[in-house]
Amino acid sequence: MTIIVTGGAGFIGSNFVFHMLNKYPDYRIVCLDCLTYAGNLSTLEPVMDNPNFRFVKESITDRDAVYKLFEEEHPDMVVNFAAESHVDRSIENPQVFLDTNIIGTSVLMDACRKYGIKRYHQVSTDEVYGDLPLDRPDLFFHEDTPIHTSSPYSSSKAAADLLVLAYYRTYGLPVTISRCSNNYGPYHFPEKLIPLMIANALNDKPLPVYGTGENVRDWLYVEDHCKAIDLIIHNGRVGEVYNVGGHNEKTNLEIVKIICKELNKPESLITFVGDRKGHDMRYAIDPTKIHNELGWLPETKFEDGIKKTIKWYLDNREWWETIISGEYQNYYEKMYANR
């Protein structure tokens, strides 16, 4: 079995690469990643010498490069993690999100059509559903919840999802889609909430929280997500969407306070900043379908997952300290200064 994993040098993609090589030692995993700011080749060092692993530095938007890789590897499956994924960056520069998330997906779809594939899996997000009101905790996103996007990022992911389903209906391409809640865990790029707060707290820097911090997110430990995708690509029904959630709803402010407590840092570091444009209020996923059909349930309680995540960042300071220098530092100053 040969699987092309696009975006495999990023956060969720790299964790998926590790999961698959560990669970299926006979599988060949080919990582296709153009190494944007969020892709880090050092993340993949533990598997670089594995004879069943190959890394290819190319963009999914490069049709010639993608076709060449398909001709060389004859993949059985493609799992597409490659995406621009940070909402704030999509507000600043939407075009790169349209290029990667929509055009890149179309290139992969065409390659799958041209060369044949047993399964194409699109890794998507619950953000395509929009948001839920804070005063309705009984409401959850289901697979048939209408798409109602709020940001250029979520709009680009929704467009890609629709394209994937169109290729299934029009061309009979064997596709599946997963829509997940917010992931956390090792190798998470430090622009996102949890790693940003861990890094800042360790350096006794302000902890910037948008608005009042009341926005609610459902948190999913990345290894649980990888196990869900593993089940979907092997046993999921073709043409179906599966919601993958963690049953760990927390306000952003709760998350930051938990991190302060775990690191023994004062809550006085918390600094409220101007809210994000179009900030979604609440995300909450109902994963009943994937549980009923594939037997998946999230295994990691948030209290345990956040401890493991913090320990990883304490044990791997060099990894994230290298990242938060240079381009990221310029971006951070732009996003949080004078707000």
Give the residues covered by each predicted segment.
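Residues that form or flank phosphate/diphosphate-binding pockets in enzymes
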Residues: 12, 38-39, 64, 188, ...
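C-terminal substrate-binding subdomain of Rossmann-fold SDR/epimerase-dehydratase oxidoreductases
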Residues: 3, 29, 58, 195, ...
